Protein backbone atom coordinates (compact mmCIF):
# COMPACT_ATOMS: atom_id res chain seq x y z
CA UNK A 1 0.00 0.00 0.00
CA UNK A 2 2.90 2.41 0.67
CA UNK A 3 4.27 1.72 -2.82
CA UNK A 4 0.88 2.53 -4.31
CA UNK A 5 0.75 5.83 -2.43
CA UNK A 6 4.24 6.73 -3.62
CA UNK A 7 3.34 6.08 -7.27
CA UNK A 8 0.16 8.12 -7.02
CA UNK A 9 2.13 10.98 -5.45
CA UNK A 10 4.36 10.95 -8.55
CA UNK A 11 1.34 11.46 -10.78
CA UNK A 12 0.26 7.94 -11.70
CA UNK A 13 -3.47 7.35 -11.95
CA UNK A 14 -5.30 5.62 -9.10
CA UNK A 15 -7.04 3.11 -11.39
CA UNK A 16 -3.80 2.17 -13.14
CA UNK A 17 -1.88 1.73 -9.87
CA UNK A 18 -4.62 -0.33 -8.24
CA UNK A 19 -4.89 -2.57 -11.31
CA UNK A 20 -1.15 -3.11 -11.68
CA UNK A 21 -0.42 -3.65 -7.98
CA UNK A 22 -3.70 -5.52 -7.41
CA UNK A 23 -4.80 -3.39 -4.49
CA UNK A 24 -8.27 -2.08 -3.74
CA UNK A 25 -9.04 1.16 -5.56
CA UNK A 26 -11.63 2.09 -2.95
CA UNK A 27 -9.08 1.60 -0.20
CA UNK A 28 -6.61 3.80 -2.08
CA UNK A 29 -9.19 6.59 -2.29
CA UNK A 30 -9.81 6.33 1.47
CA UNK A 31 -6.08 6.49 2.26
CA UNK A 32 -5.49 9.47 -0.06
CA UNK A 33 -8.24 11.48 1.67
CA UNK A 34 -6.74 11.02 5.14
CA UNK A 35 -5.37 14.12 6.86
CA UNK A 36 -1.78 14.41 8.03
CA UNK A 37 -2.76 14.06 11.69
CA UNK A 38 -4.77 10.86 11.11
CA UNK A 39 -4.21 8.06 13.63
CA UNK A 40 -5.43 4.49 13.55
CA UNK A 41 -7.97 4.16 16.36
CA UNK A 42 -8.06 0.40 16.21
CA UNK A 43 -6.42 -1.41 19.07
CA UNK A 44 -5.93 -5.09 19.71
CA UNK A 45 -8.11 -6.32 22.56
CA UNK A 46 -6.11 -7.11 25.65
CA UNK A 47 -7.18 -10.27 27.42
CA UNK A 48 -6.13 -11.36 30.87
CA UNK A 49 -5.02 -14.98 30.60
CA UNK A 50 -4.04 -15.44 34.24
CA UNK A 51 -7.14 -17.39 35.25
CA UNK A 52 -7.06 -19.55 32.12
CA UNK A 53 -3.38 -20.29 32.64
CA UNK A 54 -4.05 -21.42 36.21
CA UNK A 55 -6.76 -23.77 34.99
CA UNK A 56 -4.47 -25.12 32.28
CA UNK A 57 -1.78 -25.80 34.88
CA UNK A 58 -4.37 -27.62 37.00
CA UNK A 59 -5.30 -29.89 34.08
CA UNK A 60 -1.79 -30.74 32.94
CA UNK A 61 -0.65 -31.13 36.54
CA UNK A 62 -2.93 -34.18 36.76
CA UNK A 63 -2.68 -35.23 33.10
CA UNK A 64 0.77 -34.25 31.82
CA UNK A 65 0.41 -36.25 28.59
CA UNK A 66 -2.57 -34.22 27.35
CA UNK A 67 -2.06 -31.90 24.39
CA UNK A 68 -3.79 -28.57 23.95
CA UNK A 69 -6.89 -30.08 22.30
CA UNK A 70 -7.70 -32.36 25.23
CA UNK A 71 -6.84 -29.61 27.70
CA UNK A 72 -9.30 -27.38 25.86
CA UNK A 73 -11.94 -30.13 25.94
CA UNK A 74 -11.69 -30.44 29.73
CA UNK A 75 -11.81 -26.66 30.16
CA UNK A 76 -14.85 -26.52 27.90
CA UNK A 77 -16.60 -29.21 29.93
CA UNK A 78 -15.89 -27.39 33.19
CA UNK A 79 -17.15 -24.12 31.70
CA UNK A 80 -20.38 -25.82 30.64
CA UNK A 81 -20.87 -27.21 34.15
CA UNK A 82 -20.27 -23.74 35.64
CA UNK A 83 -22.56 -22.01 33.13
CA UNK A 84 -19.69 -19.92 31.75
CA UNK A 85 -18.73 -19.16 28.13
CA UNK A 86 -16.53 -21.83 26.58
CA UNK A 87 -12.87 -21.05 25.91
CA UNK A 88 -11.72 -21.08 22.31
CA UNK A 89 -9.29 -23.86 21.40
CA UNK A 90 -7.02 -21.38 19.61
CA UNK A 91 -6.75 -19.31 22.77
CA UNK A 92 -5.73 -22.40 24.75
CA UNK A 93 -3.11 -23.17 22.09
CA UNK A 94 -1.76 -19.60 22.20
CA UNK A 95 -1.49 -19.55 25.99
CA UNK A 96 0.18 -22.95 26.13
CA UNK A 97 2.60 -21.99 23.34
CA UNK A 98 3.55 -18.71 25.03
CA UNK A 99 4.22 -20.55 28.30
CA UNK A 100 6.08 -23.51 26.73
CA UNK A 101 3.40 -26.00 27.77
CA UNK A 102 2.84 -27.68 24.42
CA UNK A 103 3.88 -31.28 23.91
CA UNK A 104 6.75 -32.05 21.57
CA UNK A 105 5.74 -32.88 18.04
CA UNK A 106 5.64 -36.55 17.22
CA UNK A 107 8.30 -37.81 14.82
CA UNK A 108 7.04 -38.43 11.33
CA UNK A 109 5.94 -42.01 10.78
CA UNK A 110 6.49 -43.39 7.27
CA UNK A 111 3.18 -44.37 5.64
CA UNK A 112 2.36 -48.04 5.57
CA UNK A 113 2.85 -49.78 2.26
CA UNK A 114 -0.22 -51.85 2.99
CA UNK A 115 -3.28 -49.64 2.58
CA UNK A 116 -6.25 -50.29 4.83
CA UNK A 117 -9.46 -49.30 3.06
CA UNK A 118 -12.00 -50.67 5.54
CA UNK A 119 -13.70 -48.78 8.35
CA UNK A 120 -13.70 -50.13 11.91
CA UNK A 121 -15.93 -47.45 13.45
CA UNK A 122 -19.71 -47.78 13.10
CA UNK A 123 -22.51 -45.21 13.20
CA UNK A 124 -24.57 -46.63 16.07
CA UNK A 125 -23.76 -48.11 19.45
CA UNK A 126 -24.02 -51.87 20.06
CA UNK A 127 -23.42 -52.71 16.41
CA UNK A 128 -19.77 -53.72 16.75
CA UNK A 129 -17.57 -54.30 19.77
CA UNK A 130 -13.83 -54.85 19.58
CA UNK A 131 -11.49 -56.57 21.98
CA UNK A 132 -7.76 -56.92 22.48
CA UNK A 133 -5.20 -57.33 25.23
CA UNK A 134 -1.97 -55.80 26.45
CA UNK A 135 0.53 -56.29 29.23
CA UNK A 136 2.70 -54.04 31.36
CA UNK A 137 5.35 -54.49 34.02
CA UNK A 138 5.17 -53.30 37.64
CA UNK A 139 8.11 -51.82 39.50
CA UNK A 140 8.76 -55.12 41.27
CA UNK A 141 8.96 -56.99 37.95
CA UNK A 142 5.48 -58.48 38.16
CA UNK A 143 3.68 -58.58 34.81
CA UNK A 144 -0.04 -57.91 34.44
CA UNK A 145 -2.06 -58.84 31.37
CA UNK A 146 -5.26 -56.95 30.58
CA UNK A 147 -8.14 -57.97 28.29
CA UNK A 148 -10.80 -55.40 27.41
CA UNK A 149 -13.82 -54.73 25.19
CA UNK A 150 -14.79 -51.42 23.54
CA UNK A 151 -17.81 -50.20 21.62
CA UNK A 152 -16.71 -49.17 18.11
CA UNK A 153 -19.12 -46.22 18.05
CA UNK A 154 -19.07 -44.49 21.43
CA UNK A 155 -15.65 -45.89 22.46
CA UNK A 156 -16.77 -46.81 25.98
CA UNK A 157 -14.66 -49.47 27.69
CA UNK A 158 -17.45 -51.95 28.38
CA UNK A 159 -15.54 -54.39 30.54
CA UNK A 160 -11.98 -55.44 31.31
CA UNK A 161 -10.11 -58.09 33.24
CA UNK A 162 -6.55 -58.20 34.58
CA UNK A 163 -4.53 -61.27 35.47
CA UNK A 164 -0.97 -62.34 36.13
CA UNK A 165 -1.49 -65.36 33.88
CA UNK A 166 -1.66 -65.50 30.12
CA UNK A 167 -4.38 -64.48 27.68
CA UNK A 168 -6.82 -67.39 27.80
CA UNK A 169 -10.35 -68.25 26.74
CA UNK A 170 -11.80 -68.01 30.26
CA UNK A 171 -10.69 -64.39 30.64
CA UNK A 172 -12.12 -63.47 27.24
CA UNK A 173 -15.43 -65.10 28.16
CA UNK A 174 -15.55 -63.10 31.40
CA UNK A 175 -15.02 -59.90 29.41
CA UNK A 176 -17.74 -60.89 26.94
CA UNK A 177 -20.23 -61.55 29.72
CA UNK A 178 -19.36 -58.32 31.51
CA UNK A 179 -19.79 -56.31 28.30
CA UNK A 180 -23.23 -57.81 27.60
CA UNK A 181 -24.34 -57.17 31.19
CA UNK A 182 -23.04 -53.61 30.96
CA UNK A 183 -25.14 -52.79 27.90
CA UNK A 184 -28.14 -55.13 28.16
CA UNK A 185 -28.40 -56.08 31.84
CA UNK A 186 -29.97 -59.52 32.25
CA UNK A 187 -31.19 -59.58 28.63
CA UNK A 188 -29.42 -60.55 25.43
CA UNK A 189 -28.99 -58.36 22.34
CA UNK A 190 -32.06 -58.29 20.11
CA UNK A 191 -29.77 -58.50 17.07
CA UNK A 192 -26.25 -59.98 16.92
CA UNK A 193 -23.41 -57.65 17.90
CA UNK A 194 -20.16 -58.05 15.97
CA UNK A 195 -17.28 -59.13 18.20
CA UNK A 196 -14.14 -57.95 16.37
CA UNK A 197 -10.78 -59.34 17.48
CA UNK A 198 -7.41 -60.35 16.11
CA UNK A 199 -6.39 -63.94 15.52
CA UNK A 200 -5.12 -64.73 19.01
CA UNK A 201 -5.68 -68.28 20.19
CA UNK A 202 -7.84 -67.10 23.10
CA UNK A 203 -10.25 -65.50 20.60
CA UNK A 204 -10.25 -68.28 18.01
CA UNK A 205 -10.81 -71.07 20.55
CA UNK A 206 -14.01 -73.04 19.95
CA UNK A 207 -15.14 -72.45 23.54
CA UNK A 208 -14.80 -68.69 23.07
CA UNK A 209 -16.73 -68.62 19.80
CA UNK A 210 -19.51 -70.84 21.12
CA UNK A 211 -19.87 -68.75 24.26
CA UNK A 212 -19.96 -65.58 22.15
CA UNK A 213 -22.87 -66.89 20.07
CA UNK A 214 -24.71 -67.92 23.24
CA UNK A 215 -24.51 -64.27 24.36
CA UNK A 216 -25.74 -62.90 21.03
CA UNK A 217 -22.31 -61.92 19.72
CA UNK A 218 -21.03 -62.70 16.23
CA UNK A 219 -17.26 -63.38 16.28
CA UNK A 220 -15.26 -61.63 13.56
CA UNK A 221 -11.50 -61.88 13.10
CA UNK A 222 -9.18 -59.44 11.37
CA UNK A 223 -7.02 -60.33 8.41
CA UNK A 224 -3.64 -61.86 9.17
CA UNK A 225 -0.92 -59.26 9.83
CA UNK A 226 -3.42 -56.41 9.66
CA UNK A 227 -3.52 -54.58 13.02
CA UNK A 228 -5.25 -51.66 11.27
CA UNK A 229 -8.35 -53.85 10.97
CA UNK A 230 -8.71 -53.60 14.75
CA UNK A 231 -7.47 -50.03 14.89
CA UNK A 232 -9.83 -48.80 17.61
CA UNK A 233 -8.58 -51.41 20.07
CA UNK A 234 -4.96 -50.79 19.05
CA UNK A 235 -5.42 -47.05 19.56
CA UNK A 236 -6.98 -47.65 22.98
CA UNK A 237 -3.93 -49.68 24.06
CA UNK A 238 -1.70 -46.78 23.08
CA UNK A 239 -3.92 -44.30 24.93
CA UNK A 240 -4.17 -46.28 28.16
CA UNK A 241 -0.41 -46.89 28.26
CA UNK A 242 0.55 -43.29 27.43
CA UNK A 243 -2.01 -41.34 29.47
CA UNK A 244 -2.47 -43.66 32.46
CA UNK A 245 -0.07 -46.55 32.95
CA UNK A 246 3.03 -44.44 32.26
CA UNK A 247 2.23 -42.04 35.12
CA UNK A 248 0.26 -44.09 37.65
CA UNK A 249 1.95 -45.73 40.68
CA UNK A 250 2.52 -49.44 40.09
CA UNK A 251 4.88 -50.76 42.78
CA UNK A 252 3.22 -54.18 42.71
CA UNK A 253 0.45 -56.05 40.94
CA UNK A 254 -2.28 -55.37 43.50
CA UNK A 255 -1.66 -51.63 43.58
CA UNK A 256 -1.40 -51.49 39.80
CA UNK A 257 -4.72 -53.34 39.39
CA UNK A 258 -6.48 -50.88 41.73
CA UNK A 259 -5.04 -47.89 39.89
CA UNK A 260 -5.91 -49.48 36.57
CA UNK A 261 -9.56 -49.63 37.66
CA UNK A 262 -9.43 -45.88 38.31
CA UNK A 263 -7.78 -45.39 34.92
CA UNK A 264 -10.58 -47.20 33.07
CA UNK A 265 -13.19 -45.20 34.99
CA UNK A 266 -11.42 -41.93 34.19
CA UNK A 267 -11.16 -42.89 30.52
CA UNK A 268 -14.90 -43.57 30.29
CA UNK A 269 -15.96 -40.49 32.24
CA UNK A 270 -13.36 -37.83 31.41
CA UNK A 271 -11.02 -38.72 28.53
CA UNK A 272 -11.85 -36.52 25.50
CA UNK A 273 -12.02 -38.47 22.25
CA UNK A 274 -11.47 -36.74 18.92
CA UNK A 275 -14.00 -38.98 17.13
CA UNK A 276 -16.68 -37.92 19.64
CA UNK A 277 -16.18 -34.19 19.22
CA UNK A 278 -13.68 -34.24 22.10
CA UNK A 279 -16.30 -35.60 24.50
CA UNK A 280 -15.66 -38.54 26.79
CA UNK A 281 -17.51 -41.79 25.98
CA UNK A 282 -20.05 -41.42 28.77
CA UNK A 283 -20.41 -37.69 28.22
CA UNK A 284 -21.20 -38.45 24.59
CA UNK A 285 -23.74 -41.12 25.60
CA UNK A 286 -25.44 -38.77 28.07
CA UNK A 287 -25.60 -36.01 25.48
CA UNK A 288 -27.15 -38.38 22.96
CA UNK A 289 -29.71 -39.68 25.46
CA UNK A 290 -30.58 -36.16 26.67
CA UNK A 291 -31.18 -34.85 23.15
CA UNK A 292 -32.83 -38.05 21.93
CA UNK A 293 -30.60 -38.07 18.87
CA UNK A 294 -28.90 -40.69 16.82
CA UNK A 295 -25.13 -41.04 16.92
CA UNK A 296 -24.66 -39.18 13.62
CA UNK A 297 -26.72 -36.15 14.70
CA UNK A 298 -25.12 -36.12 18.15
CA UNK A 299 -21.65 -35.74 16.64
CA UNK A 300 -22.81 -32.60 14.79
CA UNK A 301 -23.70 -30.74 18.01
UniProtKB/Swiss-Prot annotation:
Keyword line: DNA recombination, DNA-binding, Transposable element, Transposition
InterPro entries, A to Z: HTH-like_dom, Integrase_cat-core, RNaseH-like_sf, RNaseH_sf, Transpos_IS3
PROSITE patterns, per the entry: INTEGRASE
GO molecular function: DNA binding
GO biological process, one term: transposition
Organism domain of life: Bacteria
Function of the molecule: Involved in the transposition of the insertion sequence IS2.
Protein name: Transposase InsD for insertion element IS2A
Taxonomic lineage: Bacteria, Pseudomonadati, Pseudomonadota, Gammaproteobacteria, Enterobacterales
Amino acid sequence: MDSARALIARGWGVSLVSRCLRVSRAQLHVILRRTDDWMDGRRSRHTDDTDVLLRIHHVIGELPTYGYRRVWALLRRQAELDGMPAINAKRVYRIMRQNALLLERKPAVPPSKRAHTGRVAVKESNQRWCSDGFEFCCDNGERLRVTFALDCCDREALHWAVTTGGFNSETVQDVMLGAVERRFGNDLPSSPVEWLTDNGSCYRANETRQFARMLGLEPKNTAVRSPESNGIAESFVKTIKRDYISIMPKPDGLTAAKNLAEAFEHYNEWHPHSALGYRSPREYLRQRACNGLSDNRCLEI
